[in-house]
Every structure is written in C-alpha cells, then in structure tokens.
Amino acid sequence: FPGFTEDWEQRKFKEFSKKTGKKNTKDLDFPAYSVSNKAGLISQTEQFDGSRLDDLEKTNYKFVEPNEFAYNPARVNVGSIAFNNLGMTVIVSSLYVVVKMSEDLDNEFILQFIKSPTFIKEVKRNTEGSVREYLFYENFANIKFPFTRNKEEQQKIGAFFKQLDDTIALHQRKLDLLKETKKGFLQKMFV
C-alpha cells in the first residue's frame, strides 16, 4: 500500500498463534455454532432449520471466544474456517480446531488471507490422511503467510478486501433479486 515502506516476509502461523478451545466440561449453556464454508460461524439452530438442540450433549463442545478462529480440520480445504466476530462466546463441535492469533496480527487481514487461493493451496500441501484429509493444528501452524510488522498496513489491507467482499455480497443479492423477478415475469407471461 502507498505510504508504507516496511519489508514483508514469509512467516509461519506457529510464531503468531496458539491452539485454544477448552472443552465445555461443566455443560454451560452457550449457543452451539458450526463453521460453514460460505457463512462462517452459523448457529446450529439456523443451520439445521430451527431444529431444537436443547437436549444436545454439549460437554464435549469447545469454547470459541470472541476474536478466535475455528475450523473443521476435515473441511478447511473448502473454506470451513471462521472468525468469531459475534461479540460473544459460542461453542463448537469437539472435532473443530480453535486458534487464537497474536496481537501482532490484524484478524481481518488474517481472515482475508485464509480465504485466499494461496492459503487453500498451502492447506492441501499440509493435510494428512488417505481417504479423508485433515489439517491438524500442528500442520496449520507450519503454514506460511505474508507478514509485515506494521499492523496499520495489515489493517488497511484487511479493510480493503473486506470492503470488496461486502460490495460483492451486495451485488450478489441484487443479482439474485433480479433473477427472481425475471423468473416471476416469465411465469406470468407464459402461463
């Protein structure tokens, strides 16, 4: 970005992250969430069409605190990784990996990186398994990413790409609405 002159280097996530996700052993009543490859963190009630989850055994679930990342190690290769920007603690399946990034990293910058084709390529290089491939934390920690010490530059880059994502989403909604309108007109016209 213009105005920034600090060097960039390739660093590994293990230098800036730690595995978190304590288990909900006391069966505390936190909302249960899943990680979607499209919507990020999504309420399990919403994901499963309003099904009642009150009787769900939640003692094996893991906490995801605000500003932590969670991912499905068997589906991260298709984008099942999310950032908790909900402003509240939630719980996720015990199968998920929960990660806290260092204060040296801007979370939006990292979120944009983990949506990138470069990250997905690195995921594929670092997975384990023959039938179903998994990205365990130890493998995630070895993935390299572009790093600058200038957090302000990280923030500007993250905000730039977030704004692009928001604009794309807005236009996608408009496109979907136009398609539905066209479909309605066609149905009325050719009845």
Predicted regions and their residues:
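Extracellular/lumenal glycan-associated surfaces
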Residues: 155-167, 171-172
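DNA target-recognition patches
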Residues: 21-54
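Non-catalytic DNA-recognition/assembly elements of restriction-modification systems
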Residues: 1-25
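A short glycine-rich beta-alpha junction/loop motif
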Residues: 90-95, 128-153
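Short amphipathic coiled-coil heptad-repeat segments
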Residues: 1-6, 10, 173-191
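A short beta-sheet element
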Residues: 48, 53-119
